[in-house]
């Protein structure tokens, strides 16, 4: 199974929409999330639960990491888990996590269903979804509430509503929240999955993803399968970036051999932090190439 740190695109798919669930496997998204909460009306949740095992089998065959987002545990969440765990999802996401106890409760319930379904105890990862201000300011504690947590995901619409923010394509209203969330996830040692871009705008999602990557994000959630190839491309070091990283490393190491503390490359001073970042970029490019050998769909269409 691909580790969370190498998963760039996390696609939410309506849980009872059979056509969307089938098509998702061809989207190229690294993680496919059957969404049983907001994307699935209560009257259709039983149908979504019934579909889960077959959908997960098809998604695995397509090379994706399989995830599901159920409902809060004090709502329909337990019924969701009882059904979907039969399909052994790789990741269980929990919406509206506002405190560490929500994660601990999910951990206990997932362990119970792992035992009941013959799944290796502890093998199912958890993905807390941060959707309220109260959860955002406790992200470190939430991320560390269970060893199953490898990543946390930031919401956009519910968080904006909780803040009373006015939504816009430029995302300015959530800029601080996205930066704060990233810092908390890095401090906790987990992957930060950025909020989705919720407009049907290819140029917009590319700008938004590249801005997120500049901050330090390496993963982004999405609600439109057409965005998967764009996000994957933006979150993957390009050939030009790899070439520049190699030049930077060579320039810095040559300067060190001459006894100089820094180098200059393209008019910019290169010191130890930049050298380390370049090494990390090369390592990530190699890991991504190994983890995702399948070709990406054409982001510009057929």
How would you name each of these model-derived features?
Residues 1-302:
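Expand to "…catalyze enediolate/carbanion chemistry for C-C bond making/breaking, isomerization
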């Amino acid at each position: 199974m691909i580790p969370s740190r190498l998963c760039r695109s996390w696609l939410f798919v309506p849980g009872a929409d059979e056509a969307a669930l089938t098509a998702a496997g061809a989207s190229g998204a690294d993680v496919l999330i059957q969404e049983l909460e907001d994307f699935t009306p209560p009257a259709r949740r039983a149908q979504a639960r019934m579909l889960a095992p077959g959908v997960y089998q098809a998604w695995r065959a397509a090379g994706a990491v399989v995830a599901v987002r159920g409902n809060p545990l004090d709502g329909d969440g337990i019924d969701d888990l009882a059904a979907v765990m039969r399909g052994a999802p790789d990741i269980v996401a929990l919406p509206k996590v506002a405190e560490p106890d929500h994660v601990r409760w999910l951990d206990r319930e997932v362990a119970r269903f792992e035992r009941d379904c013959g799944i290796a105890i502890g093998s199912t990862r958890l993905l807390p979804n941060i959707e309220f201000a109260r959860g955002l300011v406790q992200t470190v504690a939430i991320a560390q509430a269970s060893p199953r947590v490898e990543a946390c995901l930031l919401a956009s619409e519910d968080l904006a509503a909780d803040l009373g923010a006015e939504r816009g394509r430029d995302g300015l209203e959530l800029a601080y929240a996205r930066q704060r969330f990233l810092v908390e996830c890095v401090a906790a040692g987990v992957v930060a999955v950025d909020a989705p871009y919720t407009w049907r705008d290819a140029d917009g999602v590319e700008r938004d993803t590249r801005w997120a990557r500049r901050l330090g994000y390496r993963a982004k959630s999405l609600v439109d399968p057409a965005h998967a190839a764009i996000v994957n491309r933006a979150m993957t070091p390009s050939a030009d970036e790899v070439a520049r990283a190699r030049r930077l490393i060579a320039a810095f190491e040559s300067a060190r051999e001459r006894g100089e503390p820094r180098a200059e490359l393209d008019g910019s001073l290169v010191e130890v932090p930049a050298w380390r970042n370049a090494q990390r970029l090369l390592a990530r490019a190699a890991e991504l190439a190994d983890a995702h050998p399948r070709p990406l769909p054409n982001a510009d269409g057929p």
